[in-house]
Amino acid sequence: NSLTHVLCLYFTVYFFKDKRHFFDNCIEWLMPGGYLIVHMVDRESFDPILPPGNPLYVVSPQKYAKERITKTKIVFNDFEYTANFNLDKENDIATFDEKFKFEDGKVRKQQQTLYMEDTSTIVNAAQDSGFILQGKIDLVKCAYENQYLYLFTKPN
């Protein structure tokens, strides 16, 4: 009961397999009337291309692609970075496969697992923990189409 705000931004909520446990913790941490702000996406239509890999920047190339673009490639001074987003919507799991290829030939690979239930399921988990949904902010003006900030409060 000591925090006024908890921010859960940039896909953090999707790293939690047990989201109800996360929301239960947040409700304990927040003071009455405190805010929980959670960044969520429409898992089937958000643009998984990382911003530095998007040549159009302000406009999503997804609008013009016949199929959803899930791969990113970025060339930095010392290494090349590639990533691919794979969604298994039947199991509510996505993987984000990353590869860093350095000039000396060394390669680093990593895979992040995201537990991506649809947004209504996540909102219901927050409400089951006692949160009140106050609103949803569309991030389209920040060039993040199909991405949102959900604003929850702990009851007084």
Regions found by a protein language model. Name each.
Residues N1-V6:
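A short acidic, Gly/Pro-enriched loop at the edge of an enzyme's catalytic core
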Residues C8-Y10:
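Residues lining the SAM
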Residues Y14-F15:
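A short His-aromatic
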Residues K19-R20, N146:
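Conserved strand-to-helix beginnings and helix N-cap segments that scaffold or border functional pockets
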Residues R20-Y35:
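A short glycine-rich, Lys/Arg-flanked "PGG" loop and its adjoining helix->strand segment in the class I
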Residues M40-S120:
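SAM-dependent methyltransferase
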Residues T113-N156:
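C-terminal lobe and adjacent flexible extensions of AdoMet/dcAdoMet transferase-like proteins
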